[in-house]
Amino acid sequence: MGRDTIAEIITSIRNADMDRKRVVRIASTNITENIIQILLREGFIENVRKHRENNKYFLVLTLRHRRNRKRPYRNILNLKRISRPGLRIYSNYQRIPRILGGMGIVILSTSRGIMTDREARLEGIGGEILCYIW
């Protein structure tokens, strides 16, 4: 069985966010780098750096948390994997779902690379729906 790297990074970020960890280390692949760049651009994570250890590359993510808060606070409310290895979900650009009326983002894998739902609608292309973030 193969590994689902997208599900692994989503789970790692979600678990670190619930545990209020500041730093997460995930394996670096082309897909994970593209998804993390989208999360960085959209403001869900604070910083990314590439780290090499024993000829393997890792991405070290710094999550964005509010400091000095008495009550529990989570920045990333929810991440959900949609298309998975056993059930691929595709959509054309007109039927890409809007998450929370446009407040959340949908990450798609298109013929022009991995992009958000807004970018795909602007370019008029659809693709495989990888995950929802809201």
Swiss-Prot record:
Record GO terms (molecular function) = rRNA binding; structural constituent of ribosome
Q: What organism does the record attribute this protein to?
A: Solanum bulbocastanum
Keyword annotations from UniProtKB, A to Z = Chloroplast, Plastid, Ribonucleoprotein, Ribosomal protein, RNA-binding, rRNA-binding
SUBUNIT field = Part of the 30S ribosomal subunit.
Show the InterPro entries listed in the entry: Ribosomal_uS8 (IPR000630), Ribosomal_uS8_CS (IPR047863), Ribosomal_uS8_sf (IPR035987)
As recorded in Swiss-Prot or TrEMBL, the protein's gene is named rps8
Q: Which family does this protein fall into?
A: Belongs to the universal ribosomal protein uS8 family.
User: What's one GO BP annotation on this UniProt entry?
Assistant: translation
Q: Does the keyword Ubl conjugation apply?
A: no
A GO CC term assigned to this protein in UniProt:
chloroplast
**Name of this protein:** Small ribosomal subunit protein uS8c
**Record's subcellular location:** Plastid, Chloroplast
